[in-house]
């Protein structure tokens, strides 16, 4: 079986290396040249061999363009979208580009702790149809990746953005608490430590604001699905206020 990993960034490179270690014939594709030891990579799409499986690990806004390329090369391949996408994206892509076997198995890779939260960890998978699910399960199980099967591909899409929005809200609460503690001249770190002695309480750290792309982007994706989402709106506003507050402190 030939596999191509598309997008060789923080997620794609570990995925590429992991698949190679499992004994697959694997290639990498990235628009900017990346050199991976003992693995053939390409910057020209026309140079990529025709593969049985394409693993998509590009930024969210590049997924559609990549899937169009896959369709033009081998529309009968299994397409595994690991990138985070808005709900409804995967099915729309499959219909637009006539991709009949497509699954969504969003990554849970954490760059700061690849040992405990790397490529191989429990993940969700959803598919556009039964055949896609069968092929997707066969592929990921051959990689020894444990899976929770979702009843639809939309559930898998929603799961990923909900996970990150949930984390966003948790951090926003910590930021709000830190600002309140600051206004009362009480140590936030001491309050947090005390709170976290309770078995069902785990307040995260409040650092420099919710930076990076993933959590803010995915929270916006979830927010756009609702006419009204006061909790998410409040969390987004809290983070904006906190980032201003931390600069003044």
Regions found by a protein language model. Name each.
Residues 94-103, 115-201, 225-229, 238:
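Internal alpha-helical scaffold of NAD(P)-dependent oxidoreductase catalytic cores
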Residues 49-50, 120:
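Alpha-helix C-terminal capping/helix-to-coil transition sites in glycosyltransferase folds
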Residues 1-46:
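NAD(P)+-binding Rossmann beta1-loop-alpha1 motif at the extreme N-terminus of oxidoreductases
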Residues 52-56, 60-113:
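Rossmann-like NAD(P)(H) cofactor-binding subdomain of soluble oxidoreductases
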């Amino acid at each position: 079986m030939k596999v191509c990993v598309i997008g060789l960034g923080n997620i794609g490179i570990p995925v590429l290396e992991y698949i190679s270690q499992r004994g697959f014939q694997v290639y990498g594709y990235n628009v900017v040249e990346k050199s991976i030891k003992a693995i053939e990579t390409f910057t020209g799409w026309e140079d990529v061999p025709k593969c049985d499986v394409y693993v998509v690990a590009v930024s969210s806004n590049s997924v559609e363009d990549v899937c169009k390329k896959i369709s033009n090369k081998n529309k009968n391949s299994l397409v595994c979208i690991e990138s985070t996408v808005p709900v409804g994206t995967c099915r729309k892509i499959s219909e637009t580009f006539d991709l009949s076997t497509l699954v969504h198995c969003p990554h849970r890779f954490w760059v700061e702790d690849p040992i405990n939260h790397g490529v191989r960890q429990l993940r969700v998978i959803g598919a556009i149809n039964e055949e896609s699910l069968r092929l997707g399960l066969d592929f990921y199980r051959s990689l020894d990746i444990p899976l929770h099967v979702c009843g639809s591909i939309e559930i898998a899409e929603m799961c990923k953005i909900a996970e990150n929005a949930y984390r966003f809200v948790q951090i926003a609460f910590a930021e709000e608490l830190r600002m309140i503690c600051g206004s009362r001249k009480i140590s936030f770190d001491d309050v947090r430590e005390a709170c976290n002695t309770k078995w069902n309480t785990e307040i995260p750290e409040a650092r420099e604001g919710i930076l990076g792309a993933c959590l803010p982007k995915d929270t916006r994706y979830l927010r756009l699905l609702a006419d009204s989402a006061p909790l998410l709106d409040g969390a987004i506003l809290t983070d904006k206020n906190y980032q201003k507050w931390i600069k003044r402190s």
